[in-house]
Curated annotation (Swiss-Prot):
Superkingdom, taxonomy of origin: Bacteria
Gene designation per UniProt: atpB
Designated name of the protein: V-type ATP synthase beta chain
Family named by the database record: Belongs to the ATPase alpha/beta chains family.
Record has Transport as a keyword: yes
Function: Produces ATP from ADP in the presence of a proton gradient across the membrane. The V-type beta chain is a regulatory subunit.
GO molecular function list: ATP binding; proton-transporting ATP synthase activity, rotational mechanism
PANTHER family attached to this UniProt entry: V-TYPE PROTON ATPASE SUBUNIT B
Originating organism: Streptococcus gordonii (strain Challis / ATCC 35105 / BCRC 15272 / CH1 / DL1 / V288)
Amino acid sequence: MSVIKEYRTVSEVVGPLMIVDQVAGVHFNELVEIQLHDGSKRQGQVLEVQEDKAMVQLFEGSSGINLEKAKVRFTGRPLELPVSEDMVGRIFNGMGKPIDGGPAILPEKYLDIDGQAINPVARDYPDEFIQTGISAIDHLNTLVRGQKLPVFSGSGLPHKELAAQIARQATVLNSDENFAVVFAAMGITFEEAEFFMNDLRETGAIDRSVLFINLANDPAIERIATPRIALTAAEYLAYEKDMHVLVIMTDMTNYCEALREVSAARREVPGRRGYPGYLYTNLSTLYERAGRLVGKKGSVTQIPILSMPEDDITHPIPDLTGYITEGQIILSRDLYNSGYRPPINVLPSLSRLKDKGSGEGKTRGDHAATMNQLFAAYAQGKQAKELAVVLGESALSETDKLYVRFTDRFEQEYINQGFQTNRTIEESLDLGWELLSILPRTELKRIKDDMIDQYLPQTKEEER
């Protein structure tokens, strides 16, 4: 049983950090309760212990703390989340407390928010398709169970609409299996929080979702705990309740800013652009909690969303995220300004596991071939359009003009599906074939003849 120690030896408060002197038997990551002179309580966590001094990070701000009158209790246990299957359909704040007006959760157990280290040998390979209803993802950058696939966005781009669309549309094709969405929002505005809650309520998706919302006016330090709390809930539902869980985390840039704030308060030597040198390690403790385990039916799949400062993909946050995760979905400002929704730039986007979740028995036998052909045709069409800008359309061959026509229709019909359209993978594949029918059959070099005979719309081919 944990021994609770109480001290009145607070010596310093700096930003979100508090220093407690003359402590003994205190451990890293230990949960701390602070009672103020007016009787109110706040929570914190031990960040560092040196000899008889403990550094505590405060989750609920440091304003109003009287150094002489504050009582600090070290609980002897880590920060834990009370979990239960009743969490599904509920909305919580960034620290896991209900904010939807419903009753408190009756927990089946309490789980450490930092999770458990997973033995690499115990991991199962991700290879089962998740349908998001978005053609540019399902067909061209396939998401599989257990994968971590981030979305790289920018300021002003509609990543919140994309996140809400994925949250309400995502599903596994085998309807007999339980599916849930855990949504973690960090540093979002009140309007954005209302948007997410109302969207999920109106569509009924809230019934299979768990929301954790940290607002922009909540303490920044709370943002460090929010994704860990959300992932703890996801792991519980996946590995103990056999559910397939999709975790959407937005905005990871706000999380990293909170890390930088704590690092600056600790007077640490800054790394790239002022972020702490351990940013890569810290992000990996979140992203690596995705996956499947041998012997477990459930899975945890992650879609972290981050806004790239100044649309800079070389910024430390997207740069390090790309090293850890298995691909990226990139939103394009040019497509957005042209009115395309969602503005997914498919050429630089990538899902490193897309070939594992596609094919006969998972999606359809023509998935991989049409994906490769669409990529090649779109790239060639973009090159032809650039050539026309420099030399004029008269410099284009008849085949080049067909590629330009294909590219225009690909963006207008395939990418520009809107945020309310939910396409099945079969609809995405059929639309891909319809667009490929614009091109001469001799240009479809990445697809076998028997597959072309089976799927290419005959009427279009005969018209040519």
